[in-house]
Amino acid sequence: MSGTSLDGLDLVCVDFKKKKNWDFEILKAKTYSYSSEWKTCLSELHLQNSQQIKEVEKDYVNLLAKFILDFKSDIEGIDFVSSHGHTVFHQPDQGFTLQIGNTPQLSKLIALPLICDFRSQDVELGGQGAPLVPIGDLHLFKSYSCCLNLGGFANVSLPQKAQVTAFDICAVNIVLNVLANEEGLEYDSEGNLARAGHLIPELLSALENLEYYQKKAPKSLGIEWVNEKIFPLLDQYRTNLVEDRIHTYTYHIAKQIGSIFKNTDSVLITGGGAKNNYLISLLNKFSKVKFSIPDPLVVDFKEALIFAFLGLLRIENQVNCLSSVTGASADHSSGNIFYP
């Protein structure tokens, strides 16, 4: 799994079992960090033309293969590799989404079956192509009322009687990391930078009034929306201290998320944002529900874990995309399967 916050490539080896319900055990997990050159390349890829993207994809597939081969060197009995790829474009309302790395060549290089490209079919069926994690939340984390992931974006899975509703709430680390970069930091460790700042009321008001927050689910966000809506607003306040801007944006995140959880009992929090102590303290301020943070492996690797599960469902031809979540015309089993 390669996320929008560009931390690197998350790999997990998971053992799934099913008796009455699905269960899992993470046998091995590791994040392979991107070099500064790859971070720059991937962050700017949406600005390139189709030929340039194809050329980068060839190199990216080789990079994926290198990481996967290293990761699996001491593992036996692997059934398949399930890969999300790295998102370049995600504009489902325009009818397209693109993740690079989803090629038959990767299967050949790693000498294993590959399940990939989980989003395209959903978009073709009129869906948002996101979020896809809720099917995993439904089967693997049944003991929680809902699941909140704080990654590049905040997304949530909410059970609604016989079906699941899920959507992207707001941008999180994809914005916070950029602000932290201004201080020479990769990210705002434990939210300390935000904690030291002060609220900019005018900026908060402008953020709260963005049209996306008035839309009803299904809905999803991409980097294009952040570049078009969030960064221009933040740029208007560049004369303010970065501590004040990151404080205000963190406050905004907590307000948006807090408004979702008025009637839920227990919320599982995963993703890098679960380590942002200041953000978590604000969430507790804006919502009275019980937030639970699981063991570090699940916090860091839940998305990779669930994309492995999506691959398992796909190879067994079971539903792995829920129309109640994405808005597609029907539930379906999504993903391309390639063999070496």
Language model: regions and residue ranges:
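Conserved ATP-utilizing enzyme core subdomain
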Residues: 4, 8-32, 162-254, 316-317, ...
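Conserved non-catalytic scaffold segment of RNase H-like nuclease domains
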Residues: 22-59
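Short beta-strand-loop/turn "lid" adjacent to the catalytic site in phosphate-handling enzymes
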Residues: 49-103
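Phosphate/ATP-binding catalytic cores across multiple sugar-kinase/actin-like superfamilies
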Residues: 63-71, 242-265, 314
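Glycine-rich phosphate-binding loops at beta-strand->alpha-helix junctions
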Residues: 88, 265-283
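Phosphate-binding/catalytic loop of phosphoryl-transfer enzymes
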Residues: 92-97, 104, 108, 112-187
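Extended, folded domain segments that form the structural surfaces/walls around functional sites
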Residues: 187-195, 254-255, 276-289
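Conserved phosphate-binding/catalytic loops in two-lobed NTP-binding clefts
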Residues: 285-306
